[in-house]
Amino acid sequence: MQLSTLTALSPLDGRYQDKVTPLRAIFSEFGLMKFRVAVEVRWLQKLASTADITEVPPFSTQANAFLDGIVANFNETDAARIKEIEHTTNHDVKAVEYFLKEKIQSEVELVNVSEFIHFACTSEDINNLSHALMLSTARDEVILPEWQKLINEITRLAEEYKMIPLLSRTHGQPASPSTVGKEMANVVYRLKRQFKQLQNAEILGKINGAVGNYNAHLSAYPNIDWHKFSEEFVTSLGIQWNPYTTQIEPHDYIAEFFDSVVRFNTIIIGFNRDLWGYIALNHFKQRTIAGEIGSSTMPHKVNPIDFENSEGNLGLANTVMTHLGQKLPISRWQRDLTDSTVLRNLGVGLGYCLIAYASTRKGISKLEVNQPHLLEELNQNWEVLAEPIQTLMRRYGIEKPYEKLKELTRGKRVTEQAMLEFIDKLAIPQEEKLRLQKLTPATYIGASVELVEKLS
């Protein structure tokens, strides 16, 4: 059976492959090879730029350009060659080293220093920096832009519906009204916090040898400050330096990275469920799309499938990323290999994220507020005005205001007329009575509109 989108084991590479395309060049095995090649090349160039390493003279402009070209022009043919070499070495990082030694054969200047490719490095020196570059690239070029799209869409809902009143529900029961826009603004604010946290998250790397102590480095060049050298190299890649590690970078930052994504996703899961519920309550209508079918047997159905799809995929994403966050920071003694196979799944959870984010945006695009229904529902729940009435009664010193409103309203459907009669009997200033009598469930929305306008 030939591998295709129909025969792929994972739906990420099958049914949903078009939705995860931006991640493929980053987190595929091709992507990992590409970043490994880049790290190996930059390490060789760093050695050549160091005067104390006389065995690697400074590279000519031509040699540096040749090396830069290997990185910039890395392609699938190159990746296939690395894979071919690995069939012999049974070691993926060593295959990259041998590939580079092959690649430089036409440049005598580089051939003369070929044994300094991968000099003093353990495989994890190359791998951890590659993984850091993968996550940094994915964050800046894919994840944060996707988050911004979602935030923009929900912000649009907040602004568009900021004045449309909504009967709130606490514990599923009628509560003080809000507006549709204000409920969207609550979500936007939460998402923006997570955006900033991921944007500012540290992405760490190390290059310090087999157990983190520069043993091999110092055996060859004891007079070089390898600790400083390591910092210079790691930061030159745009990565923050971790000065204290075992053989592996301990991956705490990866746990922090994915924890941030999980928090963002959890907010979106709640958002999906709330919109699902609002649709069920007829607060929102869904625009139909010609040709779409909601049920194989019930022709009338227009299901909230996009929010359901998003919720399901975010659950998968969070499960994968939570495991990464819990497993990766644990490694026996100076290292064990359990992280290796797990790290090959860095992009899996993020792939499910992309599917989910697209589904939520699609669901939002179909939404249309059912304002007549919202107003009707508010008009059937005059008891929500018990709160402002008893609060004003407290101001004017009326005895047992809460208890009197509780007796009138608790567990009852109260009419407008009953509320007006209750207000009329209150011993409060006439202007306050008039203010309360003008109040309706639809206008008792507090500062909802102003809060939306202050969101930015």
Where in this protein do the model-derived segments appear?
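A structural signal for small-residue-enriched, beta-sheet-centric alpha/beta enzyme cores
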Residues: 123, 218-221, 236, 241-248, ...
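Proline-centered turn/helix-capping motifs that create local helix->coil transitions or kinks
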Residues: 105-110, 199-202, 280-283, 318-322, ...
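Glycine-rich cofactor/substrate-binding loops
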Residues: 1-34, 62, 85-86, 90, ...
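A helix-coil-helix interface module used to build multimeric assemblies
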Residues: 2-217, 221-232, 294, 307, ...
